[in-house]
A protein has these predicted regions:
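Membrane-embedded helix boundary and interhelical linker motif in transport proteins
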Residues: 1-39, 69
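Membrane-water interface segments at the C-terminal ends of transmembrane alpha-helices
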Residues: 7-11, 53-79, 125-128, 162, ...
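Helix-loop-helix "hairpin" substructures at the membrane interface of multi-pass membrane proteins
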Residues: 34-36, 110-187, 211-212, 216, ...
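Membrane-interface helix caps of multi-pass small-molecule transporters
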Residues: 9, 13, 36-47, 69-70, ...
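Transmembrane helix-bundle core of multi-pass membrane transporters
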Residues: 56-134, 241, 276-282
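Cytosolic-side transmembrane-helix boundaries in multi-pass membrane proteins
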Residues: 146, 153-160, 226-284
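Cytoplasmic-side transmembrane-helix entry/capping segments in multi-pass membrane proteins
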Residues: 1-2, 50-58, 192
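Transmembrane alpha-helical segments in multi-pass inner-membrane proteins
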Residues: 28-30, 167-247
Length: 284
């Protein structure tokens, strides 16, 4: 959401800039907005101990409210409209279309709706893979994620790594919103995003949190979502069945971890029971 708002703020201004300057500037502004917004939960975690999951959920609501304010139409009581509101849209809360110089060009036009943002996403995947698995920073990120205490003992600055990681994650989320806005919608409206963020969590889990695995999982979920409406129209099958399929896929992926956890608990219980019996036998 923040990436979309920041990119649109640049895209609807600076008319006359060439695309080679305007488009990268809009993309970078979206990533910067996402990075700042994502770094805040990391900063709160290392300074106050606030749980990052709870804080990020709260930040989601704040981002939605802030974005809604930027395109607020003003209402019927003469309230001041938002700074990005399209004055020609009357009572509709949305921004104007970004200038053509800030739009990501189509790769395949309608009905396919495929644009060059696909390549930006693939480049981001490769960069993340290289950063996480081929650099010292990536090693520190993985170490802090697996065992913060061991990372601190090894001399890694845990606080700095946490803030950096959250900021990078925010930048990637901002890039996703930017690509969606500049490539497809060309404007921002309050209903932007929907469940995309939560779908991203599901896709990451399905892809085993590996950059290349996420690509495969995202294509699977994207194909299911894209075919849902057509399936309902042509075959009469409810589109909600797609959500059921996605939930089942995730359940099957998580099943091995659940089974391992159950067996681990059972083994711990058996060992504790055996220890109790041995102690009782020895004491008698």
């Amino acid at each position: 959401v923040m990436g979309s708002v920041c990119s649109v703020a640049i895209g609807i201004h600076f008319e006359g800039l060439p695309m080679i300057i305007h488009l990268p500037l809009a993309i970078l502004s979206g990533m910067l907005g996402g990075m700042i917004w994502g770094a805040i939960p990391g900063l709160l975690k290392v300074t106050t101990g606030a749980h990052e999951v709870i804080v990020t959920i709260m930040m989601n609501y704040l981002a939605s409210l802030f974005a809604g304010w930027t395109v607020y139409a003003g209402g019927t009581q003469g309230q001041t409209p938002g700074p990005l509101w399209d004055r020609t849209a009357r009572a509709i809360s949305e921004t104007p279309d970004v200038f053509e110089s800030a739009q990501i060009p189509w790769l395949f036009g309608p009905p396919y709706r495929v644009h060059y943002g696909v390549f930006l996403a693939l480049i981001a995947v490769f960069i993340v893979w290289w950063l996480i698995y081929k650099t010292t920073i990536g090693f520190e990120i993985r170490t802090v994620g697996q065992n913060p205490k061991a990372a601190r003992y090894a001399g890694i600055r845990v606080e700095k790594t946490v803030v950096l990681t959250m900021g990078l994650a925010g930048a990637l989320a901002g890039l996703a919103g930017t690509i969606e806005t500049l490539g497809l919608n060309h404007k921002f409206a309050p209903e932007f995003g929907g469940q995309v963020g939560f779908d991203g969590i599901t896709v990451a889990l399905l892809g085993q949190t590996h950059p290349f695995g996420v690509v495969i999982a995202s294509f699977l979920f994207g194909a299911l979502d894209a075919g849902a409406a057509k399936m309902q129209f042509e075959s009469g099958v409810a589109a909600d069945i797609i959500q059921v399929i996605q939930a089942l896929v995730l359940a099957f992926v998580a099943a091995p971890l659940i089974i391992k956890a159950l067996f681990r608990l059972r083994s711990s219980g058996d060992e504790g029971h055996a220890t109790k019996l041995n102690t009782s036998w020895g004491g008698s």
